[in-house]
Amino acid sequence: MSTQSNRNALVVAQLKGDFVAFLFVLWKALNLPVPTKCQIDMAKVLANGDNKKFILQAFRGIGKSFITCAFVVWSLWRDPQLKILIVSASKERADANSIFIKNIIDLLPFLSELKPRPGQRDSVISFDVGPANPDHSPSVKSVGITGQLTGSRADIIIADDVEIPSNSATMGAREKLWTLVQEFAALLKPLPSSRVIYLGTPQTEMTLYKELEDNRGYTTIIWPALYPRTREENLYYSQRLAPMLRAEYDENPEALAGTPTDPVRFDRDDLRERELEYGKAGFTLQFMLNPNLSDAEKYPLRLRDAIVAALDLEKAPMHYQWLPNRQNIIEDLPNVGLKGDDLHTYHDCSNNSGQYQQKILVIDPSGRGKDETGYAVLYTLNGYIYLMEAGGFRDGYSDKTLELLAKKAKQWGVQTVVYESNFGDGMFGKVFSPILLKHHNCAMEEIRARGMKEMRICDTLEPVMQTHRLVIRDEVIRADYQSARDVDGKHDVKYSLFYQMTRITREKGALAHDDRLDALALGIEYLRESMQLDSVKVEGEVLADFLEEHMMRPTVAATHIIEMSVGGVDVYSEDDEGYGTSFIEW
């Protein structure tokens, strides 16, 4: 054998024995920059066979899927009899990984032995490597989490981003996903070398990965975009922080706190831009990989404090009893709240009803771009505020949006349109007024929002919700969830009013999108005076006035039922025809 052949054999042997070396060669062949320190550390963790059941979490854009696909090829090169199952939230994502694995095999000449041979499986979604023995299961198979998982056995299961916004936004969706991933136990070969590797970024505070860690014995290894910023964040990471980052941080925590972990990939300026784009909560989830956010003090607004009910469009009970027990939980509406934050209807309500008093349409205008023009229709009665409709429109205050808003005002018979004066000189009012008049005759009032938005929203909504004075029409919740879409028209729960409500904090920039929530808060601020009513006391006063008035009338025999409205309260009584001014006698 020639000297060059010897050198080549030594290099190949080194690559086969060292995944990091293999990664450097592959990155060079793909014309990618040299692997960064976090990518190298990630490769070392993947190659460590002692990690049998673990969750690899790394900030968005680090290339964890690419590195894992490279690891699959390297593993098959070392042991062609391995069976590897790749599962993703969608079949397209799983297939993309499978295609990339095949491309790696085709790209590197020294891997030519792994190319499928005649008679072996050789498709995008299922293929064998050349030296593999005939087997019921292919060497590599890709499948979506809702696809045909059964019928395959695997030495290594790689779950790559099985949790995405669309399958984790509601409690029902999260429970379904949890049921699906429990199938992995039946697919994994019962061997000491078998492994399950999750790759992912938390999508919600109730992330699947937290459940796996708490209830299924998985360990989590995290590469956040920044070193721990606070003592609390450092406590959360604890031993979850990647070993390399943990050693670096512990050596000099004061200097490293809040600095980029991989400045070659994302420097401070890059990460500041992403924090503005995602909002503080979104950045903490997707770049800091910290789902440990769901405490009542941080998130002051909870769905369980509101009353959800099917509402009459003309009148409502004068008083409700709120009791958040199991029998009052509503389970057939999409719930985007935090874990344990259920939707509840009322426990009981008054037999007396009254017609709604104030009716307003509140609008939070926006410019063009990612923001919506948020709106809410609010009614009041006896100290309660009723949310009858809410939503958002694109295109700022285009003619189409203004026409739709004017039609909403007519549909709900509002007495006043309230709008935020965030365009200076009442510009929105001047533009909207003539269009509104074409459809509906009502007053228009401008309201100026003051102070930091997040503080104002929380301070306005928290007392209303904690005293259970916000009543939400049930259809609002369903329509809000279905209409939550991003600028490209794709469903995005971050545009939902109730997602915004349950994720806002008093920190500046807490939400990337808050238009629908801001409209609701503006409306409740406008209606603040009506909230100061004591509903039970007012109901009693109205009834007392009715009785006092009728006690002054002469009594007669009663044979007929009559109905009247007094002080906004519907009253049913019996009276003789022709004695409308007389009191009843039994």
UniProtKB/Swiss-Prot annotation:
Subunit annotation: Homopentamer. Interacts with the terminase small subunit; the active complex is probably heterooligomeric. Interacts with the portal protein.
NCBIfam families (UniProt xref): termin_lrg_T7 (NF033889)
Class in the EC hierarchy, top level: hydrolase
Full protein name: Terminase, large subunit
Cofactor(s) listed: Mg(2+)
Enzyme Commission identifier(s): 3.6.4.-, 3.1.21.-
Entry remark concerning the domains of this protein: The ATPase region is in the N-terminus, whereas the nuclease region is in the central part. The C-terminus is involved in prohead binding.
Name of a matching Pfam family: Terminase-T7_RNaseH-like
Function: The terminase large subunit acts as an ATP driven molecular motor necessary for viral DNA translocation into empty capsids and as an endonuclease that cuts the viral genome from the concetamer to initiate and to end a packaging reaction. The terminase lies at a unique vertex of the procapsid and is composed of two subunits, a small terminase subunit involved in viral DNA recognition (packaging sequence), and a large terminase subunit possessing endonucleolytic and ATPase activities. Both terminase subunits heterooligomerize and are docked on the portal protein to form the packaging machine.
Positions of region (ATPase activity): 1-229
Binding site for Mg(2+) 2: 364, 420
Entry GO terms, CC: viral terminase, large subunit
Renumbered ranges of motif Walker A motif: 58-65
Region (Involved in prohead binding): 571-586
GO molecular function: ATP binding; ATP hydrolysis activity; endonuclease activity; metal ion binding
Region (Nuclease activity): 344-429
Organism: Escherichia phage T7
Keywords attached to this entry: ATP-binding, Endonuclease, Hydrolase, Magnesium, Metal-binding, Nuclease, Nucleotide-binding, Viral genome packaging, Viral release from host cell
InterPro entries in UniProt: Gp19-like_virus (IPR047987), Gp19_RNaseH-like (IPR054762), P-loop_NTPase (IPR027417), Terminase_large_su_gp19 (IPR044271)
Gene Ontology terms describing biological process: chromosome organization; viral DNA genome packaging
Family indicated by similarity: Belongs to the Teseptimavirus large terminase family.
Residue ranges annotated as motif Walker B motif: 156-161
Binding site for Mg(2+) 1: 364, 518
